[in-house]
Amino acid sequence: MRAMAYSRFGPAPNVLALNTLVSTPPADGEVRVKLAYSGVNPSDVKARAGARPGVVKPAFDLITPHSDGAGIITDLGAGVSKERLGERVWIWNGQWARAHGTAAEYITLPATQAVALPEGISLQTGAVLGIPGLTAAHCVLGGGAVAGKT
């Protein structure tokens, strides 16, 4: 599959390159998603630039960046409902704690990180629901019930 990736820190034009990588089949509890869109977050930019305190080199030899995205589930690992095959999903924390994020044609990740996208919501919109959407939910709901407070 085609994937953008980097092996050293720096500005995107200096370190990102198009690569041909193997798409990993899903393990137990995982799904493989054919990505339509990849969302870019400030945390992705900071990670690629090496701007996180105390981090002096990339965590993996080659990193496909980006945490968020959207696409269609194409393959299922054991233990994942067959009903999910073909499901439109949005992805959150795609590149967290692993080398392969959403700047690729496919991503394989835990099924819980591929959330069903409601009808009427485009894949393009789904690609920006991950970190921004979860951040908004935590801001609104983190202080307890919101009933009567709006």
Model regions and ranges:
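Conserved hydrophobic/aromatic beta-strand scaffold that supports enzyme active sites
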Residues: 18, 23, 70-72, 106-108, ...
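Cytochrome P450 core scaffold surrounding the K-helix E-X-X-R motif
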Residues: 43-49
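Glycine-rich beta-strand-centered segment in the early N-terminal region that forms part
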Residues: 22-40, 52-95
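Short gly/ser/thr-rich secondary-structure transition/capping motifs
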Residues: 12-18, 53-55, 97, 134-135
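Nucleotide donor/acceptor-binding cores
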Residues: 1, 87, 148-150
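Short structural boundary motif marking the start of a folded domain
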Residues: 1-4, 31
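Extracellular beta-rich ligand/substrate-recognition surface
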Residues: 7-15, 67
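NAD(P)H dinucleotide-binding glycine-rich loop of Rossmann-like/cofactor-binding domains
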Residues: 67, 82, 92-150
